[in-house]
Amino acid sequence: MNGVTNDKGHSDVTNTPESGISTPKKKNPKSDKPVKVKNPNNAASKAYTVDLKIQGTNNSSIVSKRSVERLYKEKHDLEFFRHFVKKPQRRSPIINRGYWTRMEAMGYCISAALAEKAPKHVIVNLGCGYDPYPFQHLHKHGLTENLIFVDVDYPDLMQIKVDTIRRSDELTKLVGEEKPAAEIKDKSVLMQTGNYIALSCDLRDLEKFEFIFRNLDLIVEGDNNPLILFTAEVSVTYMFQKDADNLLQWCASLPNSRFALLEQIIPAGTEHPFAKTMLAHFDSLQTTLWSVKKYPSIPAQYERFTCLGWKEVSGISLAQFWDSYVPDEKKEFVENVEAFDEWEEFLLFLNHYSIIYGGADIFQNSKSEYPEHEEFVLQCEKPTSEAHRIGAAACSFQNGVILNGGQAQNRESTSLLLSLDSTDEFIVDKNNMIARQYHSLSEIEPGVVLLAGGRSSPTKKFSDCHILKNGLWKPTFDLPEGRFRHCMQGTLLFGGSESKDQWLHFSPTAGWKALKCDFHYLTPYGATLIMKSPIEGILLGGMDAKGNLGKEVYSVTISEGETVVLSLIPMKSPLIYARYGAQGVYHGNRYLLVGGVSYDILFNEHNQVVELDIKKGNTIPVKLPFESYPLLVSHSVNIVRNCLVVAGGGAVCFSFGVFHSDPEVVGNRELKVIKEQRPSEEVKTEINSTVISVEEGTLESFPAAYVNATPTIFRNCDIGPSSELWKSHDYLKSNIGEDTKVSVHIADNKNLNFQSKNFSYQTLQFGELMKLISDIEADSESSKSAYLRSLSLDNPKSEATDLCKDFPGIARDFKLPKEMADFIGNKVFSTPLRISSSKTQIWLHYDVTANVLCQVTGSKRVRMYHPRDVVHLGFPAGESSSKIPNIFVHESCAQAYEVVMNPGDILFIPPMWLHAVEPQTESISVNCFWKDLDGNKYSKTKDIYGNKDLASYESGREGIKKIADKFAGLPADIKEFYLRRLAEELKQM
């Protein structure tokens, strides 16, 4: 192997267009694959092809490092990768942060060597690729005879690097004046200045390598030996093991030498999901990592260095380097560069890389703590599964676990039921929730599930909450602020991203309430809350804004005064339970901690699940004999029928691929994965003759009714003296004005219908209207109807009616209860006055705005239907009024809801709920409509009634017409075939 090139960090193809550099690969004009060059020595041909593949790992690596350089450049830094990468690309945050840490670790080692006193410092980069470490440090330290950088790699690659330096005035100035070719003693030296040497050499030929070093006066006899630091950043691992070890041993034999080795490790073995994915990635590229299997861990690397002659050795994982050797100010700088929430993937990556330093003790050696308790075993079964979701939320539900959202191939908004009962069905109406992950699900009462928060990206967090009940998701009270990575048990929520109030309690009728806690938990992001009961549990782990892990365990007690009391629990082996993103349950009288990630330990099959014995302060390993090695990050854990169900989970394993964990159930039970099924519209063929009473509520529960979009009747409310004063026609005529002109619906029948227009609009004086109603009421045989729905008196064609403005003489008599008025606030759109004769039915219709109907005098029957039944109740396309003549006698498959309103009763009617009214007596009522969506969501045309459909629906209808027009000219049956297919596709959206 001729030289060594630092690694390829990505699986994407590396070629000339990506790096902008001439590649040393020789190509077949008909193929992108490297040509197996026919050498005179056929035995060398295969090795040469492998060498080409190893050289190819450089291109993508430097594209990633260039991405880091552009984004993470500090104030006085120069951009050196730009000379080698002509077409920069922005990598993902996890790739950027991973490479930043690698570069920072290698820079730390170089700085440590330069800080040692020595007559001269020589920094030798083995497998340098296009790394610009010489330029960076020469820019920092300047040209000096006491500092030399030596870059070593394949001849073709080094020639490109030298040519690039020579073309750049900036780089030429940094490295200094070149020696004339005639003065260079060895042709392997492609470039030499007083501070820089570019060298191509076969590192297996150590005798030749040493000869070159001596010719360059890099090795001298006596006491004036320079300090030589050899660096190898994911490079010598591509050499055959014996050759790599010989190189390390030769370096150790040199006086005053150091070695900084950064390469992969597999501390949890080859079967760990991340390790397995990583090794498969490099094998697929035919760039096998030869060192990692013989030296899989930091202790193994220690032994390697010691056996090869290094008297002092220190080393840590890159996770420990980030945790302990990256200063807080640098961490803060990195945090502010780009949004980031891939901590599980980041720590998995860092735990699979080590930085080993031979020749000096520059790292405080860290030993992972493993408890020496005997582990106990739980039985486990694995289902066949399609439940591959990363960052999904889950909770117990029915006979299993409901799994919502998360990342599969795409981010999901749907749910799955992982059931222990093979006969279960999972019928859930389509929801309009935004796809999300890292939210919470909690069963707040049997069969009722609360979804809270989450995010789509680290910068887009959600505050919306939803309740699943009877197969229907409904919105409920929003969180006080958006949050994700929180934990929730029952109705108790803790922590999450940038949460002002750490502890919240949820009530279905009152919403979220902040709980008091005298102790501010320092690491609330991705912490673990395990509740033994609704008022007792433990809290541990998590992370703060600087990336520090919580290393304490606290008992949690909820007092009667709605105060959270935290008390420190003395525990041993903090490295075992100091975790981010772990899940926990109380099962079999045990606190179980499952999965998560840490800086100090890459959790394996023996310690990724532990029992926390809070009485003795011990952690006890729990063996779960999974059929395959699960990756217990971004997962969920729940108890169902005394069985432990582990669901979801997995990670994007840096650039090496994606690993998904299959669900597991502990307890020898089979688990069935059931996808969401929509309620079938076709089954609604039988007549539904049942009528359900509208739910009653208290004024305190009005906000809950609103956020849950639940029709609710509020009885006997204080609406002012109007319910008494407005009984008198004389009072009304006196205070409105007998000659005030109003527009009235007049009909010779009792069933008014907007579609058939079986009424007329007549302008009457108010006194005439009241006389007409009196006459109708006096004649029990009369079939006439009179109905006033007030309009604006000043601008009836352009303004919505306002009770206070249009009827100031009586408006003072009426008031909304304070609870409602305060909640609605200044969003009121219209307040129409309604006066009608008895039995005057108003047609079935819907309003796009929420409203409350306040009954002032008389009584009124109201019939309502859920918005989803609009397809069954005679609504023409683009119309908000039904064609059904009399909905009160109409036979339908839709479920009806009814209520009879009396004076002082107030009915909340959510947007889009279909409703019709039938006064039982002469009736007066007041509506209050308010707009609760952004203004641009409503129709752009004038809408004084508030019943114009939303702008998106109007736009959608135009789009449908355009789609239908595309099928013009096709036979009718073919057109119908495809339009029906499109209609079905719309239903699934």
Swiss-Prot record:
Keywords for this protein: Methyltransferase, S-adenosyl-L-methionine, Transferase, tRNA processing
Signal peptide extent: none
A Pfam family the protein falls into: Kelch_4
BP terms from Gene Ontology: tRNA methylation; wybutosine biosynthetic process
Membrane-crossing residue ranges in chain numbering: none
Region (Disordered): 1-42
EC category name: transferase
Keyword Glycosyltransferase among record annotations: no
GO molecular function, one term: tRNA methyltransferase activity
Compositional bias ranges of the Polar residues kind: 12-22
Reactions it catalyzes: 7-[(3S)-3-amino-3-carboxypropyl]wyosine(37) in tRNA(Phe) + S-adenosyl-L-methionine = 7-[(3S)-(3-amino-3-methoxycarbonyl)propyl]wyosine(37) in tRNA(Phe) + S-adenosyl-L-homocysteine; 7-[(3S)-(3-amino-3-methoxycarbonyl)propyl]wyosine(37) in tRNA(Phe) + S-adenosyl-L-methionine + CO2 = wybutosine(37) in tRNA(Phe) + S-adenosyl-L-homocysteine + 2 H(+)
EC code(s) of this entry: 2.1.1.290, 2.3.1.231
Residues of the JmjC domain: 805-947
Recorded superkingdom: Eukaryota
Function: Probable S-adenosyl-L-methionine-dependent methyltransferase that acts as a component of the wybutosine biosynthesis pathway. Wybutosine is a hyper modified guanosine with a tricyclic base found at the 3'-position adjacent to the anticodon of eukaryotic phenylalanine tRNA. May methylate the carboxyl group of leucine residues to form alpha-leucine ester residues.
Sequence similarity: Belongs to the methyltransferase superfamily. LCMT family.
Protein's name in the database: tRNA wybutosine-synthesizing protein 4
Organism of derivation: Yarrowia lipolytica (strain CLIB 122 / E 150) (Yeast)
Primary gene name: PPM2
